């Protein structure tokens, strides 16, 4: 099964899930008629809970032009999680993440099949959002991690956002990892479902590494830049 971002003209209305056979020929749609997501991107399923949840990037007509903030105001980027019955393909619930969950991308359930909890990285708002099952069986969400922007010199703005891209959960469900794209740091958090704590961080280059015109502002007006990463002396 693959997730689609739009139709041939780049409109988000073409978001859907396609079933492929063993030779990658299209067999048809997975979701029931009228149950397509508002935007497409990633998805993850938890069969024991009979649930699949998908995330929502944006319309190809918007992001194919490069990122423009007015497209967010025009509703061309997503802020939703779509909750489906698995394997039936019925859209059961749409979670609106609001202003704290703009552009939710990679979505991950815990690997433990008995758990109904997972996380999604929201790129534009630099938040990790936790989703979970409530007592009545519906889904809810809350912000688990917020990455603060760096105050910087010599950039187009005075603050540089984290812009979370990929996220991963360790196979033992102890740690969550994610990357901040322009910051260029990789973070490790221990997973207490409601209180994730930063336990590791590695800087791997980016806009504020040494030699760059950009610098991060820290206390007392001082500036800071990350070291240039070396691997085996290179």
Identify the role of each PLM range.
Residues 3-13, 56-76, 130-133:
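Short, conserved, GDST-rich strand-edge loop motifs in beta-rich repeat architectures
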Residues 13, 39-41, 77, 103-105, ...:
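Beta-rich catalytic cores
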Residues 83-89, 130-143, 188-200:
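Short loop/turn segments immediately following beta-strands, especially the blade-tip
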């Amino acid at each position: 099964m693959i997730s689609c971002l739009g139709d041939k003209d780049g409109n988000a209305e073409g978001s859907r899930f396609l079933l492929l056979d063993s030779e990658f020929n299209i067999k048809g749609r997975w979701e029931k008629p009228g149950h397509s997501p508002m935007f497409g991107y990633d998805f993850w399923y938890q069969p024991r809970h009979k649930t699949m949840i998908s995330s929502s990037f944006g319309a190809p007509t918007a992001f194919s032009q490069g990122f423009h903030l007015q497209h967010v105001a025009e509703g061309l980027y997503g802020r939703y999680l779509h909750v489906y019955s698995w394997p039936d393909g019925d859209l059961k619930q749409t979670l609106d993440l609001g202003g704290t969950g703009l552009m939710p991308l990679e979505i991950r359930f815990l690997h433990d099949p008995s758990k109904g909890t997972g996380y999604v990285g929201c790129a534009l708002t630099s938040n990790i959002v936790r989703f979970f099952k409530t007592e009545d069986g519906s889904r809810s969400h809350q912000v688990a991690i917020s990455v603060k922007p760096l105050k910087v010199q010599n950039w187009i703005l005075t603050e540089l956002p984290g812009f979370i891209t990929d996220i991963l959960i360790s196979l033992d469900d102890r740690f969550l990892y994610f990357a901040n794209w322009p910051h260029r740091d990789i973070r490790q958090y221990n997973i207490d479902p409601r209180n994730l704590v930063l336990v590791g961080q590695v800087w791997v280059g980016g806009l504020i590494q040494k030699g760059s015109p950009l610098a991060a502002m820290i206390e007392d007006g001082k500036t800071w830049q990350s070291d240039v990463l070396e691997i085996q002396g290179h």
